């Protein structure tokens, strides 16, 4: 029996078999539904009228993992201009005309999908996305054609619930203060959405 066992001394190389341990890989449990709906709250800087609280809702449809479309509605109430504050009793707008409401439809692109790590073994799918859209803004008694450019960060807390941090610039032409100019109305929001 001893003569049948090959040895390195006899010129036969010994084969080393590595011990391979198969690792269990758990894929992120992202909901397979393509619709996403939710609400947001934040602040918007209405040009010439200061910053105000803004809130609204969004509905998105994900065509692929990278491309989506979303409809957004938001509302706020403009403050007073510096001219109104300095002049005292002058009111450029009525209370109803100070209501700032926008509707837009945008296309979004998940530019940097990835994961956010919390602790040693907790990872959540995330994505940095860009949006470009157009719509209408009702402000100062007029409807303004509006272009909206934005970016956001989506973090999937569960397979159906996500949080969003977003920034968006609503741009439209206005001649409210005597000269026609392109106004920039920058918005920062925090929101929650659900996939269904």
Question: Can you annotate each of these PLM segments?
Answer:
Residues 35, 66-69, 114-117, 155-163:
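Repeated loop/turn-to-beta-strand initiation elements of outer-membrane beta-barrel proteins
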Residues 2-60:
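Short glycine/proline- and aromatic-enriched beta-strand/turn motifs that initiate or cap beta-hairpins
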Residues 103-110, 184-196:
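Outer-membrane beta-barrel "beta-signal"
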Residues 25, 43-44, 89-95, 135-138, ...:
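Extracellular loop and loop/strand-boundary signature of outer-membrane beta-barrel proteins
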Residues 39-43, 55, 71-75, 109, ...:
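Transmembrane beta-barrel strands of outer-membrane/channel proteins
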Residues 33-35, 51-55, 99-103, 126, ...:
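Residues that define the transmembrane beta-barrel architecture of outer-membrane proteins
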Residues 67-140, 144:
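Gram-negative (and chloroplast) outer-membrane scaffold detector with strong preference
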Residues 60, 108-110, 117, 152-154, ...:
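Transmembrane beta-barrel domains of outer membrane proteins
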């Amino acid at each position: 029996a001893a003569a049948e066992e090959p040895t390195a001394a006899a010129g036969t190389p010994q084969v080393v078999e590595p011990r391979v341990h198969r690792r269990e890989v758990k894929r992120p449990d992202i909901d397979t539904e393509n619709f996403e709906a939710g609400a947001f709250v934040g602040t918007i800087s209405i040009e010439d009228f200061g910053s105000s609280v803004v809130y609204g809702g969004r509905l998105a449809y994900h065509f692929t993992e990278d491309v989506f479309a979303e409809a957004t509605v938001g509302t706020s109430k403009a403050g007073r201009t510096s001219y109104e504050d300095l002049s005292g009793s002058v009111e450029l707008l009525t209370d109803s005309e100070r209501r700032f409401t926008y509707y837009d439809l945008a296309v979004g692109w998940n530019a940097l999908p990835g994961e956010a790590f919390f602790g040693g073994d907790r990872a959540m799918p995330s994505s940095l996305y860009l949006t470009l859209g157009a719509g209408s803004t009702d402000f100062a008694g007029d409807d303004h054609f509006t272009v909206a450019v934005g970016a956001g960060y989506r973090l999937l807390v569960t397979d159906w619930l996500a949080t969003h941090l977003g920034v968006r610039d609503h741009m439209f032409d206005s001649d409210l203060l005597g000269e026609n100019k392109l106004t920039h109305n920058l918005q920062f929001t925090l929101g929650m959405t659900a996939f269904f």
